[in-house]
Regions:
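Non-catalytic, mobile gating and regulatory segments of ester bond hydrolases
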Residues: 1-35, 39-165
């Protein structure tokens, strides 16, 4: 797992799990929908992994990430995908640059089931990425054309934030 992503997750996980315990008691449920964008999706991937292995009392129903970077190596991805029992999508948008970081050349991989949206967010493709990234999806622009910050900040025609924040 990337050291920076782990450091970020390790910094917030106690607060997140404390709040999760409070909310699950308040609403009398342990069913979860987990989601994140960008760095938040990297943290959510690590949190999901922790839940799968260390918190079996929670029931993950859905896991949707938007603009996620590559979080771990092939062993991490294989372990994550093998344990996964819930609906899981890693949504990417056209030439978004973040899903191509850190580079594959450094042995980073994505967890499976990419959904790739076109430039206008009007059509999508369910990608064949069980074994490796699908070169007809987000990886089709790699490595030199995937440079769009705007695509990273706009998913499903919703502005996630602004460039430079």
């Amino acid at each position: 797992v990337d050291g920076g992503f782990y450091k970020y997750y390790d910094h917030v996980k106690t607060d997140v799990f404390d709040n999760l315990k409070v909310m699950s008691a308040k609403y009398n449920t342990r069913d979860l929908l987990l989601t994140g964008h960008s760095l938040g999706s990297a943290g959510m991937t690590l949190m999901t992994y922790d839940i799968l292995y260390d918190f079996p009392e929670y029931n993950i129903l859905y896991f949707y990430n938007f603009g996620s970077p590559r979080v771990g190596n092939d062993m991490f991805v294989a372990d994550f995908n093998a344990k996964k029992y819930f609906e899981s999508f890693r949504v990417t948008h056209y030439y978004d640059m973040v899903p191509h970081l850190p580079p594959e050349d450094f042995y980073y991989k994505h967890i499976s089931r990419e959904i790739w949206y076109n430039e206008e967010n009007t059509q999508y493709k369910v990608c064949d990425d069980d074994e490796d990234e699908d070169d007809s999806c987000s990886n089709s622009c790699a490595p030199t054309k995937c440079t769009s910050v705007d695509d990273h900040m706009n998913y499903l025609n919703v502005s996630i934030g602004s460039s430079g924040c």
